[in-house]
Amino acid sequence: MPKIERFKTRHLLRKREQKEELDRIERQLRAKVTGLGTNTQFEEGITDDGSRVLLLGGTIVFFELEGKLFPTLRALLDGIVSIPKIVVDMGAVKYVTNGADIMRPGIRSVDDGIMEGSVVAVVDERHGKPLAVGVSTMSSDGLRAATGGKVVISKHHVGDELWEFGKSVE
């Protein structure tokens, strides 16, 4: 996850660059980017630590980590992109929001179509709100069959620097 204090550089993407980025996001996430108007303008930012982020209206909506673009929780909350979900029980919420990886015993349900290495949203069972974005270590069937172990590696969660930076922009 990028360490964000300020941006080294920040610039608007050209229409062609924006289309290329959206195509890349849709290809990597296997999900459609929606909720964007026709005049939507993305910005690209480079943080102090060299991490690359995409902004929409001053809010970070995607960040690059290990060569892959991930949606932020704000992008999920705003309906910009919809990715497969893994629902966790309320007992796991405290750990997930502190950045813990997701363990199989805390999972209540799993969306179909998750493949090993897929980017997934971790949501709570009561409110259905996203708590974290991570990478699945198993397919949907594997997740359902597993009885223990780490099943999602957390990359971004409520309360981390990326989340806090987004709060300061609002």
What are these regions (language model features)?
Residues 2-51, 56-59, 64-108, 113-116, ...:
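Beta-strand/loop-dominated core regions that host nucleotide or nucleotide-derived cofactor-binding catalytic loops
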